[in-house]
């Protein structure tokens, strides 16, 4: 894994047949990515996999060696197909069972009378895992080494990220600027490539769009060096003016 301050990276593993089938649209990647960006962690890979134990184990074992942080979403609920916790235990060769602290949290949250088998299942995880507290619905996520296991429900996941801020050691904050223009990609491809060659430590992406009846392209400029972003944007604006391409917005 890359441990330098200059670059800290992460991957997300989305676990769930409902995502792969198209029944549910994932929004957690956007939430986690924006949060990581603020912490100076670059999201470099996202995988969507099914609720199959071997697939989870294989994917996590591969990514935990490759990235500083791995975030999993989904599969830690009360039903039979929620198998992420058990799979993570096997990936790390750890004992799986009732986590004492998680059990106590859930028993208190639901009350003994309503603390049924399904709810107790949410306390089952690697027994030596660190917990990620859940201010929304009680059931905690957990951490093993550099793997962070979160629920798939977007609102709950988002509420849990705040408690992780001090656990994530990021690199330099990543700054972003966007320039939108009214043109087609082919008109700016060559000069944009020349700018990218000049600013090798800046990531430049171009994304075509169609809105309000107009065709356009958004250029997203990203770097941990704010001055380089500003200089890069000046170069882009300069060639846009030379080519008389209308800017639709800059932020």
Question: What are these language model-derived features?
Answer:
Residues 2-46, 51, 227-230:
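Glycine-rich phosphate/diphosphate-binding loop of Rossmann-like nucleotide-binding domains
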Residues 30-83, 89-90:
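N-terminal small/polar loop signature for handling phosphorylated ligands or for N-terminal nucleophile
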Residues 146-239:
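An accessory alpha-helical subdomain
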Residues 239-251:
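Conserved short beta-strand edge segments in small beta-sheet-based binding/regulatory domains
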């Amino acid at each position: 894994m890359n441990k330098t301050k200059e670059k800290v990276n992460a991957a997300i593993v989305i676990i769930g047949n409902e995502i792969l089938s198209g029944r549910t649209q994932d929004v957690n990647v956007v939430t986690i990515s924006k949060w990581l960006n603020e912490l100076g962690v670059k999201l470099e890979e996202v995988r969507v996999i099914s609720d199959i134990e071997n697939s989870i184990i294989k994917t996590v074992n591969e990514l935990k060696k490759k990235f500083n942080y791995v975030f999993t979403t989904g599969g830690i609920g009360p039903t039979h197909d929620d198998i992420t916790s058990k799979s993570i235990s096997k990936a790390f060769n750890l004992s799986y069972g009732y986590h004492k602290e998680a059990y106590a949290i859930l028993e208190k949250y639901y009350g003994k009378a309503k603390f049924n088998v399904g709810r107790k299942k949410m306390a089952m995880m690697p027994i030596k895992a660190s917990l990620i507290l859940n201010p929304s619905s009680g059931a905690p996520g957990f951490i093993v080494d550099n793997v962070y296991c979160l629920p798939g429900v977007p609102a709950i996941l988002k509420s849990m990220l705040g408690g992780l801020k001090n656990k994530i050691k990021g690199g330099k904050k990543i700054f972003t600027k966007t320039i939108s223009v009214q043109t087609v990609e082919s008109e700016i491809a060559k000069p944009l490539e020349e700018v990218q060659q000049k600013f090798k430590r800046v990531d430049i992406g171009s994304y075509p769009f169609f809105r309000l009846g107009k065709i356009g392209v958004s250029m997203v400029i990203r770097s941990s060096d704010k001055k380089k972003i500003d200089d890069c944007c000046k170069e882009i604006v300069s060639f846009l003016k030379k080519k008389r391409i209308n800017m639709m917005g800059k932020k």
